[in-house]
Amino acid sequence: MNSEDYRYLPACGADYVTVFQETYDLKKYETLHLLGHKRVWPYRFEAQERALRGGMRGVGFSALLGLSDYHKDALATALHVYYLQRKYPQAEFSLSCPRLRPIINNEKINPLDVSEKVLCQILCAYRIFLPYVGITVSSRENARFRNGIAKICATKISAGVSTGIGDHEEKYTGRDTGKTGDEQFEISDTRSIRSMYGDMEREGRQPALNDYLYV
């Protein structure tokens, strides 16, 4: 989408966009995206800035750790945020740190090893380097890890997640659309919103389903 396209979204109720860069390794990126606009790496890289120019309240960033050298991808993600945070100080910024999971029906893509210890180090480094950004921890991680990292540096935790193509449409419309597909990746933390809410409260935290209001 171009900046002009993003200008329509706030009127429709959307004011935040997250773009998964996937990897900042240009050679690896080209092997994964063979066709379409997404193949043009600079256009993908500038997506968050186009969204901000189009009037979006905030933007999110992420590399898919394990696609390429996670050291370089983690550093590049942080520098990407750092650059735009100083260029657009009024905007809200957030980071997500998903690890590549085994892909159903696809044996060709195997995640490079990113252990829980490594992931924790990356998340803590993000918090130190970018103290004011939101940090989201994916449901790709198990409940034990997510509960622990929420005590250290994470600010956003998803719940009630479905990765099946078309699952949300059927859930909220109550209709069998016939459009559902395989799950895009395996989920480790399957807790519902109610269950997650209760677990956070028991640990002395105050869960918030919305962290901003327009006045």
List each language-model region with its residue ranges.
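Aromatic/hydrophobic pocket-lining residues that form the small-molecule binding cavity
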Residues: 2, 41-44, 74-77, 119, ...
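Core AdoMet radical
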Residues: 1-52, 57-61, 89-96
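Short, hinge-like loop/turn segments at secondary-structure boundaries
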Residues: 14, 35-37, 78, 153-154, ...
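Catalytic cores of alpha/beta
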Residues: 2-11, 57, 67-82, 142-152
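Generic structural signal for helix capping and beta-alpha/helix-loop junctions
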Residues: 26, 68, 166-167
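Conserved strand-turn element in the central/C-terminal portion of the radical SAM core barrel
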Residues: 1, 34-36, 47-73, 96-112, ...
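Conserved, mostly hydrophobic/aromatic
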Residues: 19, 51, 81, 126, ...
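Auxiliary Fe-S-binding modules of radical SAM enzymes
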Residues: 75, 86-215
